[in-house]
Amino acid sequence: MDVCMLEKALSDKTKAVMAAHTLGNPFDLQAVKDFCTKHNLWLIEDNCDALGSKYVIDGEEKFTGTIGDIGTSSFYPPHHMTMGEGGAVYTNDPLLNKIARSMRDWGRDCVCPSGMDNLCGHRFDKQYGELPLGYDHKYVYSHFGFNLKATEMQAAVGCAQLEKFPSFVERRRHNFDRLHKALEAVSDKLILPVPAQNSTPSWFGFLITCKEGTSKNTVVQY
């Protein structure tokens, strides 16, 4: 990611920067975070490739996905951990938390957890748009949304995966080091990946870039 392009892309319509930690190798979070702070923008980290990666920002090492205003993860089978399908959105911001939960639950305006009603104490005493006064707030859908809740079985699989997750990350780093060492002999033909500055990647893939004179098809068919 060329962070120098951020200023060129900025306009009056810009509200957020969303960027991915491609293949587990973090982008320049310090530069992007500083840019977002300077221009009062949300920072959304697509952390689907990088669960378990770490980055040193402002002198403190943090997990990627926790530095921006929003982080995302994917639990599709090839990723660092799986629940069969689905993913997660995480944030420390109360407003973004409310918005994400609403979008997850069909755009529901009420934020009461499942099985708990009237936590706000105003379930039946307000008016919403042209709906009649006292309309049940639990069934007011004020925004667009989806039905994106995980099943209990998926959650159980996810909990089991979390227990094994540190070993998954360790194995991915081991495999990366093994591949890198094996391919150093042909580094005159290939550009091998290296960790971004100030980062400890949790690798999702191994990027190989062919140097001039080396055919991609030759590498693929080898």
Stretches with model-predicted labels:
Residues 1-98:
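Active-site phosphate-binding strand-loop segment of PLP-dependent enzymes
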Residues 2-4, 8, 16-20, 29-31, ...:
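PLP-dependent aminotransferase class I/II
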